C-alpha cells in the first residue's frame, strides 16, 4: 500500500507542476486547445514524462519519506539474517541484489520500489520484524521480491503514463467546450486554466481506480510468486498473522498488505490491495 500511495502522490504532484508548464508551452507555441494531434502528442510527452520522473525518484522518495536506513553492512544478527535472506531470494528469483533497508514503525509493513530491477529497494518495518517469525518474514520478503521480478513498478508507470495523457487531454478538451462562447474561445485566460486544473484533479481521482485495480491484481501475482519462492503455507501464515493484528485505519486501508474485514464496493475501487481473506483464499486454492 505504502509504495503505491507514495507513487500516486508523487505522480499527482508532478502532474500538477507539469500541467502548469504545459499550459505555458501551449500559450507560447499557440497549439489549439480544442483538440488536435499536436495536443495529444504534447499530453503524451508530458504525461509519460511525469510518470517516469516519479519512477526515477521512487527509491529516493521512499527512503526519505520513511526515514529508512539502508543496510550497507549488517550491524546485528537480525540484519545479517535479513540481508542474507534477501540475497538468497534475489538469486533464486533471477534478479540483481536490491538495497535492503529497515525503518522505524510499529506497523507490520514492507515494500519494494525502484526504477528497475537493477536499482530496486526492499524495506521492512521494525514492527514487522518484531511481530512475525522467521518463516513469515521470509514469505513477506519473497512477496516483495516477486514485485521486483515481475517489474510491477515499471508496468505501473506505463499505466500511469497512459492515464496522465488522457487526463490532461480530456481536461483541456472539456475545459475548451465549457469556455466556448465566452471570451476564452482559444482556451486562454485564468478561468480556462482554473477549469483545467479542477478537471485534472477530478479525472485523476476517478482514473486512479484503474491503477488500484491493477495493483490488486499484482498483489495476487506477488502472493503466488512468494508461494513459488518459499512455499504457499508460509505466505498464508504471514497473511493470517496480519489478519490477527490490530486493524490500521489510514484512509480506510491497512498499511501492510491489505485491509482487515470487508469493505463496500465503492470503497474497494480505491483499495490498492485485496482484502486479506481473498488473498488467503486464492493461495489455498492454488496447487
Swiss-Prot record:
Known EC number: 3.4.24.-
Binding site for Zn(2+): 143, 147, 219
EC top class named in words: hydrolase
One cellular component (GO) term of this entry: plasma membrane
A Pfam family assignment: Peptidase_M48
Cofactors (names): Zn(2+)
GO MF annotation list: metalloendopeptidase activity; zinc ion binding
Stretch forming the signal peptide: none
Subcellular location: Cell inner membrane
GO BP, one annotated term: proteolysis
TM ranges: 4-24, 37-57, 158-178, 194-214
Active-site residues per Swiss-Prot or TrEMBL entry: 144
Topology of this chain in the membrane: Multi-pass membrane protein
ATP-binding keyword on record: no
Cofactor note: Binds 1 zinc ion per subunit.
InterPro entries in the record: HtpX_protease (IPR050083), Pept_M48_protease_HtpX (IPR022919), Peptidase_M48 (IPR001915)
The entry's keywords: Cell inner membrane, Cell membrane, Hydrolase, Membrane, Metal-binding, Metalloprotease, Protease, Transmembrane, Transmembrane helix, Zinc
Family: Belongs to the peptidase M48B family.
PANTHER family from the UniProt entry: PROTEASE HTPX (PTHR43221:SF1)
HAMAP family membership: Pept_M48_protease_HtpX
UniProt-recorded name of the protein: Protease HtpX
Organism this protein belongs to: Idiomarina loihiensis (strain ATCC BAA-735 / DSM 15497 / L2-TR)
Amino acid at each position: 500500500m505504502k509504495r503505491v500511495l507514495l507513487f500516486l502522490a508523487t505522480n499527482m504532484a508532478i502532474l500538477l507542476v507539469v500541467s502548469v508548464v504545459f499550459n505555458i508551452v501551449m500559450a507560447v507555441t499557440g497549439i489549439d486547445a480544442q483538440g488536435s494531434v499536436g495536443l495529444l502528442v504534447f499530453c503524451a510527452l508530458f504525461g509519460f514524462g511525469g510518470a517516469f520522473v516519479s519512477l526515477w525518484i521512487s527509491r529516493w522518495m521512499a527512503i526519505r519519506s520513511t526515514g529508512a536506513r539502508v543496510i550497507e553492512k549488517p550491524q546485528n544478527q537480525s540484519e545479517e539474517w535479513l540481508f542474507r535472506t534477501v540475497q538468497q531470494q534475489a538469486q533464486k528469483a533471477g534478479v540483481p541484489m536490491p538495497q535492503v533497508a529497515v525503518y522505524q514503525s510499529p506497523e507490520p509493513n514492507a515494500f519494494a520500489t525502484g526504477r528497475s530491477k537493477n536499482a530496486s529497494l526492499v524495506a521492512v518495518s521494525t514492527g514487522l520484524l518484531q511481530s512475525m517469525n522467521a518463516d513469515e518474514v521470509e514469505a513477506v520478503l519473497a512477496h516483495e521480491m516477486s514485485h521486483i521480478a515481475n517489474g510491477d513498478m515499471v508496468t505501473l508507470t506505463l499505466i500511469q503514463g497512459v492515464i496522465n495523457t488522457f487526463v490532461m487531454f480530456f481536461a483541456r478538451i472539456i475545459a475548451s467546450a465549457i469556455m466556448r462562447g465566452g471570451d476564452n474561445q482559444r482556451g486562454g485566460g485564468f478561468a480556462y486554466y482554473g477549469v483545467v486544473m479542477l478537471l485534472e484533479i477530478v479525472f485523476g481521482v476517478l482514473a486512479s481506480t484503474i491503477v488500484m485495480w491493477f495493483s490488486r491484481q499484482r498483489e495476487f501475482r506477488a502472493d503466488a510468486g512468494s508461494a513459488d519462492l518459499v512455499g504457499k503455507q508460509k505466505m498464508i501464515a504471514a497473511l493470517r498473522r496480519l489478519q490477527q493484528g490490530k486493524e490500521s485505519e489510514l484512509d480506510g486501508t491497512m498499511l501492510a498488505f491489505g485491509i482487515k474485514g470487508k469493505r463496500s464496493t465503492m470503497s474497494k475501487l480505491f483499495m490498492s490491495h485485496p482484502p486479506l481473506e481473498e488473498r488467503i483464499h486464492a493461495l489455498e486454492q492454488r496447487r
